[in-house]
């Protein structure tokens, strides 16, 4: 399509890393296309970072034509949905070519629904030649909304713990940045005058998680 910018990379690891950075910077799902099983394997090192960063990546991988998957012909990805696990939130190979548009739509919404994470979709090569099923255009109008809030009893217990604490500290994990809750973290720390720490091995930088300079130094906890 005219509004689709396709960027070719020399190695799947670099391509996944590029998409990861774009997804984190934009807050939108990034699309990555890998070369069958071998390309998926090459990209899984970078996919580890994407998983722990909660990056909304929609990863598609090529697959042999359907008639040749069972005989394990060259480039056949046997049991494709299992290959990227456990580094993806959802993985799938459509049972029929007509299910590909719906599966792509589900992949996009799943990657971008909290908690955000990479998803994986294996698509046989000959599926692209098949006609789309009737009504596929309605997928463009599909919207997914989610909402959640702590139970009032949980909030009351948390407030009591904070009020009773002698020297409370705030430890931030990567989801603070992934959910754009940075300002709320700053407000909470300032309200209770808490020092701020970053969880060990966090996949987000300290300045990204807690960007406001303050007297209480923001630094990572030692593992």
PLM feature spans:
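N-terminal alpha/beta PP-like core and its mobile active-site loop of ThDP/TPP-dependent enzymes
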Residues: 1-223
